[in-house]
Curated annotation (Swiss-Prot):
Enzyme Commission code: 6.2.1.1, 6.2.1.2
Gene3D superfamilies in alphabetical order: 3.30.300.30, N-terminal domain of ligase-like
Compartments reported by the entry: Peroxisome
Motif position, Microbody targeting signal: 567-569
Gene: AAE7
InterPro entries per record: AMP-bd_C, AMP-bd_C_sf, AMP-dep_synth/lig_dom, ANL_N_sf
Entry annotated with the keyword Lipid metabolism: yes
Disruption phenotype: No visible phenotype under normal growth conditions, but seedlings have a strong decrease in glutamine and are resistant to the toxic acetate analog monofluoroacetic acid.
Name of the featured protein: Acetate/butyrate--CoA ligase AAE7, peroxisomal
Length: 569
């Protein structure tokens, strides 16, 4: 009898009145209804309202659909943070297609691979990057030969750029974006996906440790992340958000969709400099922005003439992408920024943990606060499970702040999988978890703290060294602007730490040999002897488009330097 009652309750059907697939596209529809005249996107002298943005997105969807672009199609966009990039996050999935945001800092061979691998049938490209698209297509055609089918090419004009590149693109047969929109219907009757598991976006990993892989995201995950971001961050209706984070990186951590939730205002930036960040904060009363630690480092070390301090109001900053040094968090706080430290991956739609602030931390010394806030924290509201597991047994490590293991996730904010890569999917989803490849400890308060990427751990004389912890010490040296520590071959210990350092401008003319010795001495006073860098290399550090230092390049450089000769420690 009990079983029958349970079945009667459970078997009530899903019908159109009580069920629709979750998709972030509905947030745009609502914003246009509730706040039709509120500013949605500002880019230089161009401003759009939510009503206008909704109409433009529907025009884009309609124009694509008229050219038989829809479910099963992929639309690539190669552009910086401009209105068209924002519109693509809605207009492309509105016609049922998948959005593929391409990193503008990649070279033509890599872009050619991504466009071919994703089978993008449309390429939307900012005028400044038309040559990149053109070179990529030429490489694709050379490889494919007579079987090559040229994608539809749409060039996005930008009033802040010189017209020559736009004119050249048009002379090559590209369709201008505004002309393309004009062919679409602003009342296009878009439909939500039939299944929320339907793909909404495709992005490629940055390749900081390996070749990029295609990460496929679904409507359900994008919807949940779009709601989780403002909930975790305490964002208010009408937030003013500065686009310092590239939208092409993991769909801007899903903030294009989050801003529609809030009917907020996007302030676009083509190029990010500390001076522009301060200027936009003052001009538009920016309340929030996201940035990698390298951008925070530039902000706190900006020349006085580039800053506007004290800040006219509190500005909230979300950082992720690499473990931020506590010294940088401390400096940001001193300047009036309130930093929320998060952690995540392209495979988890962006941030999926947050170092949630606790009231009892308020009374602690600022340095202690910064150290606590440098941890990666606890799972996002929309992420069902997070743990740190022993890589050999698969069991959770103790919450002792010492025992290291791998960070793993399980939930609706985990990707569908890697495109056309079954072997990688089998490995990354082993045991029913998504394996991050990041090594961390779990503290007694259950906050996690990353110690390293599994590939970045330095093994010296059989002992593990956390490159992150060595970097945190190096960052405290007064001459250091940026630092990254990798393994270098060592004749005695197999490997030893090698520090790659970018100097602050005041120290660039100093004797580098003396500075290297001083940095090593500084580290020796604060670290175990075998953790101290045995070599220091000065110069700019290679980075991804989001500011993450590319350690795989530095590891190659360190290897090419040859082994450290018979060091004692």
């Amino acid at each position: 009898m009990a079983a029958t009652k349970w079945r009667d309750i459970d078997d009530l059907p899903k019908i159109p009145a009580n069920y629709t697939a979750l998709t972030p596209l509905w947030f745009l529809d609502r914003a246009a209804v509730v706040h039709p005249t509120r500013k949605s996107v500002i880019h230089g002298s161009r401003e759009y309202t939510w009503r206008q943005t909704y109409d433009r997105c529907r025009r884009l969807a309609s124009a694509l659909a008229d050219r038989s672009i829809g479910p099963g199609s992929t639309v690539a966009i190669i552009a910086p943070n401009i209105p068209a990039m924002y519109e693509a996050h809605f207009g492309v999935p509105m016609c049922g297609a998948v959005l593929n945001c391409v990193n503008i800092r990649l070279n033509a061979p890599t872009v050619a691979f991504l466009l071919s691998h994703s089978q993008s049938s449309v390429i939307m490209v900012d005028q400044e990057f038309f040559t990149l698209a053109e070179d990529s297509l030429r490489l694709m055609e050379e490889k494919a030969g007579s079987s090559f089918k040229r994608p539809l090419l749409i060039v996005i004009g930008d009033h802040t750029c010189a017209p020559e590149s736009l004119n050249r693109a048009l002379s090559k047969g590209a369709i201008e974006y505004e002309d393309f929109l004009a062919t679409g219907d602003p009342n296009y009757p878009w439909q939500p996906p039939a299944d929320e598991w339907q793909s909404i976006a495709l992005g490629y990993t940055s390749g900081t440790t390996a070749s990029p892989k295609g990460v496929v995201l679904h409507h359900r995950g994008a919807y949940i992340m779009a709601l989780s971001n403002p909930l975790i961050w305490g964002m208010q209706d009408g937030a003013v958000y500065l686009w310092t984070l590239p939208m092409f990186h993991c769909n801007g951590w899903c903030f294009p969709w989050s801003l529609a939730v809030l009917s907020g205002t996007s302030i676009c930036l083509r190029q990010v400099t500390a001076k522009e960040v301060y200027s936009m904060i003052a001009k538009y009363k920016v309340t929030h922005f996201c940035a990698a630690p390298v951008v925070l480092n530039a902000i706190v070390n900006a020349p006085k003439e580039d800053t506007i301090l004290p800040l006219p109001h509190t500005v909230h900053v979300m950082t992720a992408g690499a473990a931020p040094p506590p010294s940088v968090l401390f400096s940001m706080n001193q300047k009036g920024f309130r930093v929320a430290h998060t952690y995540g991956l392209s495979e988890t739609y962006g941030p999926s943990t947050v170092c949630a602030w606790k009231p009892e931390w308020d009374s602690l010394p600022p340095e202690t606060q910064a150290k606590l806030n440098a941890r990666q924290g606890v799972r996002y509201t929309g992420m069902e499970q997070l743990d740190v597991i022993d890589t050999q047994t698969g069991k959770p490590v103790p919450a002792d702040g010492k025992t290291a293991g791998e960070i793993v996730f399980r939930g609706n904010m985990v990707m569908k999988g890697y495109l056309k890569n079954p072997e990688a999917n089998k490995e990354t989803f082993a045991g029913g978890w998504f394996h991050s490849g990041d090594i961390a400890v779990k503290h007694p308060d259950n906050y996690i703290e990353i110690k390293d990427r599994s590939k970045d751990v330095i093994i010296s004389g059989g002992e593990n060294i956390s490159s992150v912890e060595v970097e945190n010490v190096v960052y405290h040296h007064p001459a250091v602007l940026e630092a990254s520590v990798v393994a270098r071959p060592d004749e005695r210990w197999q490997e030893s730490p090698c520090a790659f350092v970018t100097l602050k401008s005041d120290y660039e003319k100093h004797d580098q040999n003396k500075l290297a010795q001083d940095i090593m001495k500084f580290c020796r006073e604060k670290l175990p002897a075998y953790w101290v860098p045995k070599s220091v290399v000065f110069g700019p550090l290679p980075k991804t488009a989001t500011g993450k230092i590319q350690k795989h390049i530095l590891r190659t450089k360190a290897k090419e330097m040859g082994p450290v000769p018979r060091s004692r420690l």
